[in-house]
Swiss-Prot record:
Official protein name in the record: Ribosome biogenesis regulatory protein homolog
Lineage start: Eukaryota, Metazoa, Chordata, Craniata, Vertebrata
Top-level division of the source organism's lineage: Eukaryota
Organism annotation: Rattus norvegicus
Residues bearing PTM Citrulline: R273
Gene (name only): Rrs1
Subcellular location: Nucleus, Nucleolus
Amino acid sequence: MEGQSVEELLAKAKQEEAEKLQRITVHKELELEFDLGNLLASDRNPPTVLRQAGPSPEAELRALARDNTQLLVNQLWQLPTERVEEAVVARLPEPATRLPREKPLPRPRPLTRWQQFARLKGIRPKKKTNLVWDEVSGQWRRRWGYKRARDDTKEWLIEVPGSADPMEDQFAKRIRAKKERVAKNELNRLRNLARAHKMQMPSSAGLHPTGHQSKEELGRAMQVAKVSTASVGRFQERLPKEKAPRGSGKKRKFQPLFGDFAAEKKNQLELLRVMNSKKPQLDVTRATNKQMREEDQEEAAKRRKMSQKGKKKGGRQGPSGRRKGGPPSQGEKRKGVLGGKKHSRPPALGGKKKGVPHHGGKRRK
């Protein structure tokens, strides 16, 4: 029994070792192409096993992927290794397969105004050397920048032009001109950036006119500006004949949380009475008077507009020889006099008007 058990153990160990070798060693009819720089293995063998697998080749696909991965790992173990911070690493070679880009190619930079002008006129840039001979110092110096040749800022004497003011400081004028050139270059640079990003420039994106503002809008804007201080307009100075602003602010009075149950009951009952009452809440007299006032204002605005047009036309005459905007002739009828109705609405309820008999009542404001 002991001999059989030893033989069985040896056979089992031999079988396990063979299985391990079988897992590591993979045989292929055609050798795989490896690109170790990208950790890529290309299998050119025909997939005969997959064709025989039928409609569900998942197991065959897993086995094929495992074999190809094993071959790739075997190639990695053949690479030279080195120790980096107590870790053994393998240095991969340069990749041989060119992979596609993750992102699209960068767009070309938009041309500046000078580049567009140069392309239009056919101007080609000429390459200049950085160093030039300076006759004053007798040595080679830079063409631009610090310690450049023919540096006029280092001159201690400046000739005053004949057309210039003899009392003007030419040194300060030169510094001021240089600052203006720097500011102009910066403005052109910002314009090029805005043109490249398709932004709207301040010249065309500034504040636009809001049209004519009425008296109410101006008063509201003035009131808002006055209460925009830290003291909410309490210590704001007023003009000599300026009126106090109406409705500038009222403190909200809250009812007590506990105590006055009678007043609370009264308010709730009043609210229920108003909600359950069938009487309409609209004041007909007030609504009618408001409508009449609006119509009067519209007609007054129209008459004012017509009178302004007549003043603008002046002494210009029509084809009949009569001045435009002048009084009508005897044969014509005036609008709003006998023969025409001035208003097509009923008289005001309880109101008072010129030329209309008063029927009593007061006009509510």
